[in-house]
UniProtKB/Swiss-Prot annotation:
Reactions catalysed: dCTP + H2O + H(+) = dUTP + NH4(+)
Top-level taxon in the UniProt lineage: Bacteria
Hydrolase in keyword set: yes
Complex and partners: Homotrimer.
Record's keyword terms, sorted: Hydrolase, Nucleotide metabolism, Nucleotide-binding
GO molecular function annotation: dCTP deaminase activity; nucleotide binding
Binding residues for dCTP: K107, S108, T109, Y110, A111, R112, T131, L132, E133, Q152, Y166, Q176
UniProt similarity note: Belongs to the dCTP deaminase family.
Gene responsible for this protein: dcd
Enzyme class: hydrolase
Functional pathway: Pyrimidine metabolism; dUMP biosynthesis; dUMP from dCTP (dUTP route): step 1/2
Protein name as catalogued: dCTP deaminase
Length: 184
């Protein structure tokens, strides 16, 4: 597998719609950076958030996740309670080629503040808005800024095309739009 450079990312976004909307050059002035970097793409977080709350003293169960545990917010700044988390989504819609696997890493700006971003890999031929999970590991409230960088996607091109893609097996998160809760 090869890590793909900025030139390839730019070409795939422009000719194949791999990332829409696409920011061709990294934006950094007064914001948490986003756009193309040397070997990745820094995606932005949208204004759509679901913030975890323990109002109903719920148990978190990935097999039977209760939306009652979340409070919906559309805002420019999301405040995550101490030792809690929020779900969000990327501004960008991704269409992953059949011979590419994408991994995601959190932004160091957030990590240095105790905020961890988690995303599972984007599999070959998956498409949709990426649901992001922000964990506030601190004992204080933490801010997430909509419209700014949230995480970096690294594109790994396989030496051969996979036999079965995410689309082939009708993956449960295919084509997701908006913040998407766990599904079985």
């Amino acid at each position: 597998m090869s890590v793909m450079p900025d030139t390839w990312i730019r070409e795939m976004a422009k000719t194949k719609g791999m990332i829409e909307p696409f920011t061709e050059k990294q934006q950094r002035a007064g914001v948490i950076s986003y756009g193309v970097s040397s070997y990745g793409y820094d995606a932005r977080v949208s204004r759509e958030f679901k913030i975890f709350t323990n109002v109903d003293s719920a148990v978190v169960d990935p097999k039977s996740f209760s939306p009652n545990s979340l409070v919906d917010r559309e805002t420019d700044i999301c405040v995550i309670p101490p030792n809690s988390f929020a779900l969000a989504r990327t501004v960008e819609y991704f269409r992953i080629p059949r011979d590419v696997l994408v991994i995601c890493l959190g932004k160091s700006t957030y990590a240095r503040c105790g905020i961890i971003v988690n995303v599972t890999p984007l599999e070959p031929e998956w498409e949709g808005h990426v649901t992001l999970e922000f964990s506030n590991t601190t004992p204080l409230p933490a801010k997430i800024y909509a419209g700014e960088g949230a995480c970096q996607f690294i594109f790994l091109k396989g030496d051969t095309v996979c036999e079965t893609s995410y689309a082939d097996r009708s993956g449960k998160y295919q084509g997701q739009q908006g913040v998407t809760l766990p599904r079985l």
